[in-house]
A protein has these predicted regions:
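Bergerat-fold GHKL ATPase/HATPase_c domain
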Residues: 1-122, 153
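Short, well-structured alpha-helical interface segments that form or flank functional binding sites
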Residues: 56-67, 136, 180-187
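A short beta-strand-to-loop motif within the catalytic HATPase_c
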Residues: 79, 201-208
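Glycine-rich/acidic phosphate-handling loop/turn and adjacent ATP-lid/helix
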Residues: 82-181
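Conserved glycine-/histidine-rich ATP-lid loop and adjacent helix of the Bergerat-fold HATPase_c
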Residues: 185-201
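Short C-terminal beta-strand
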Residues: 208-219
Length: 219
């Protein structure tokens, strides 16, 4: 996604998707993880897939994006949880202490709209960007709970070790138990490999301020 491209807000313009052009960048800010927001996202995905004549991949791409959004929302909840408990997520001793209680208590807050509002008040966000260039749909998710280098290394290790494994093998033999088996990310990559001919169909990285997950769909 070109950083110099002007960004069109889908949130602010009801008719933003009526005439999608090559190279345009569209932004959708996920205000909350409500069913209404998810339904809006599905409609957005449908419009972009129509543009590249790949409507048949609608359900699978929605599944991938929902998993990525879920991961982003959970990351924001985790960060907000640590902040509200005066714990530094980057300090090993605080991280270990915080994760013990977070796994039991923190994720239950995902449906607590008061906590969701608190997350927004802290300035934490999930933003989605969509652009089509030369027939390739790029969907980029950004959230400002920055993934650590260690976590990125774990994700890439999981992806590497999952190559040439069947879905059954992946579920029967989890690769890394750190904060879950990471099967969601692995399945996203496998799904994208089936519906996209782009060699770099999935990537996750981090800047100093954001975690960036990119999906490329090329018929």
């Amino acid at each position: 996604m070109s950083v110099s491209a002007s960004i069109i807000s889908i949130n602010e313009s009801a008719g933003a998707l009526t005439n999608i052009q090559d190279g345009q960048v569209f932004e959708y800010v996920l205000l909350d993880p409500s069913p209404e927001s998810k339904e809006r996202l599905k409609n957005i995905v449908q419009e972009f897939l129509k543009k590249i004549n790949l409507e048949k991949s609608y359900n699978l791409l929605c599944l991938c994006l929902e998993e990525i959004i879920s991961n982003s929302v959970k990351a924001n909840i985790k960060r907000a949880y640590f902040i509200s408990h005066n714990l530094d997520i980057n300090k090993p001793e605080d991280y270990e202490k915080g994760m013990k209680s977070f796994k039991e208590e923190g994720l239950s807050k995902i449906k607590d709209m008061r906590f969701v509002k608190k997350i927004a008040d802290m300035g934490l966000y999930v933003k989605l960007y969509f652009t089509i260039q030369n027939g390739c749909l790029t969907s980029t998710a950004k959230n400002n709970s920055v993934i650590s280098k260690e976590e990125i290394d774990r994700v890439n290790t999981k992806l590497k070790l999952s190559e040439n494994k069947s879905a059954e093998d992946l579920f029967m033999n989890s690769i890394d138990q750190t904060e879950g088996a990471g099967l969601g990310i692995i399945m996203i990559k496998k799904i994208l490999s089936q519906i996209s001919s782009a060699p770099d169909c999935f990537a996750i990285s981090a800047t100093d301020t954001e975690t960036v997950t990119e999906l490329k769909i090329l018929p």
